């Protein structure tokens, strides 16, 4: 959804979760344990990444499909729980803010990475709804997944992200709360664009 908003506004787009997935992928490929915060932070600082034409590249290799597996989502959540890793990736994320603007997608974008953002939106939906959407995305990309497994992994991720000591997942008062359980992607995009234009006009 955030990418659709960025396209509509002609802004740059940051998928912050991809940076944590890339760190996790690099660590797993090199056999690093995901509980070694110091080593993970070093990997995060040295990542050779590029985003081109909707694809993600790591050290010159297209890793787009590998990043979108459920396994990598779980690994990324584990990696993101380490304050050392978050600190290393903070400046890399902030470097994406370039004219004419940026739409950043991530669980701590408004609270930590861009606390001065002119518009913050806290997106949520029932876990079952998010699981259905995620399952559809995976199947469309040819990645088989069982619905109960997707639901369970989302619940675990929510629990981890809400309880981590640094940048826990929660709704902050200065962010618009948008529940998309019964709202289509098109409707959600329209709501965010309308809010942005209202603020720009005021």
Residue ranges and their predicted role:
Residues 13, 120, 175-177:
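Conserved beta-strand scaffold positions in the cores of enzyme catalytic domains, especially
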Residues 4-70:
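N-terminal phosphate/diphosphate-binding loop that engages ATP/GTP or pyrophosphate donors
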Residues 16, 20, 37, 41, ...:
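Amphipathic alpha-helical transducer elements in NTP-driven molecular machines
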